[in-house]
Regions:
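Short, solvent-exposed loop/turn segments at secondary-structure junctions
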Residues: 25-28, 35-36, 68-70, 89, ...
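A short secondary-structure junction signal
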Residues: 30-34, 41-43, 72-77, 86, ...
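Short beta-strand His + acidic residue motifs that chelate non-heme Fe in jelly-roll/DSBH
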Residues: 71-73, 82, 92-105, 113
Length: 142
């Protein structure tokens, strides 16, 4: 229920897919560009879908579930992200930015990855959120 409230209430997504990722010491996800081949509507094909023509129809958000630990990195374009806090949310224009992750540290890094169709609420959230924005997210307690 909390994951649904976040997707629909705060991010304004619908027809979304939610994945829990864990990255342990020594794992990396090489730099890549998303094409959403694994989305259920694409069914691992390279058929052109509406969001290939208009990428704003689908967006991806990542929610960090635990605080950053030494040795963990998140790379997007020319930026390297570290020092995140549990509950921090990042997103990017999936069709334009190469990205990847690595965990050289001792602690496992956990994220929730939302990929879904956008609404006006999604774009309001994106356009009115900065790196300093604060949103009330209670993802750890009942």
């Amino acid at each position: 229920p909390k994951a649904i409230a976040l997707a629909e209430g705060l991010l304004g997504l619908y027809d979304y897919e939610l994945k829990l990722h864990s990255q342990v010491c020594g794992q990396l996800l090489h730099m890549h560009m998303d094409n959403f081949a694994a989305r259920l509507d694409r069914q691992n094909s390279f058929d052109e879908l509406d969001y290939d023509v208009d990428p704003k129809k689908v967006h991806r958000f990542v929610v960090f579930l635990n605080d950053w630990s030494m040795g963990q990195i998140w790379h997007q374009g020319t930026a390297v992200h570290t020092h995140w806090k549990a509950g921090d949310i990042i997103s990017w224009h999936w069709q334009d930015f190469p990205h990847g992750t690595a965990n050289m540290g001792w602690d496992t890094r956990y994220i929730l990855q939302y990929t879904g169709r956008t609404t006006d609420k999604t774009w309001d959230f994106i356009n009115n959120t900065t790196k300093d924005s604060k949103h009330k997210l209670n993802i750890h307690k009942e």
